Amino acid sequence: MKFEAVVRTELGKGASRRLRHAGKFPAVVYGGEEAAVAIVLNHDDIVNQMDKPEFYEGIVLVIDGAEVKVKPQDVQRHAFKPKVEHMDFIRI
């Protein structure tokens, strides 16, 4: 599976809320030798694939043109809506 991601320029609660209202959500990629990167993902693209087992075995994120193989590490979900609030990915 391959998903497009964009590096986040704005950080904080207000910026994250604006992303969620726009149908996106914040995430972070960390691990390995490289520094952690804050990214933005399209909510519907990710949520539609999260019920498949291969999603949790490893996916490819295209972050500003560079492909990074990652695995979901943590998912924060909304309390009662079927929405993802934030995700952590670890490089593999």
UniProtKB/Swiss-Prot annotation:
| NCBIfam families the UniProt entry points to | PRK05943.1 (NF004612)
The keyword rRNA-binding appears for this protein: yes
Under what name is this protein listed? Large ribosomal subunit protein bL25
Q: What is the lineage of its organism?
A: Bacteria, Pseudomonadati, Pseudomonadota, Gammaproteobacteria, Vibrionales
A biological process (GO) of this protein is:
translation
Coiled coil residues, start to end: none
Function, as annotated, reads: This is one of the proteins that binds to the 5S RNA in the ribosome where it forms part of the central protuberance.
A Gene Ontology molecular-function term? 5S rRNA binding
Q: Which GO terms describe its cellular component?
A: cytosolic large ribosomal subunit
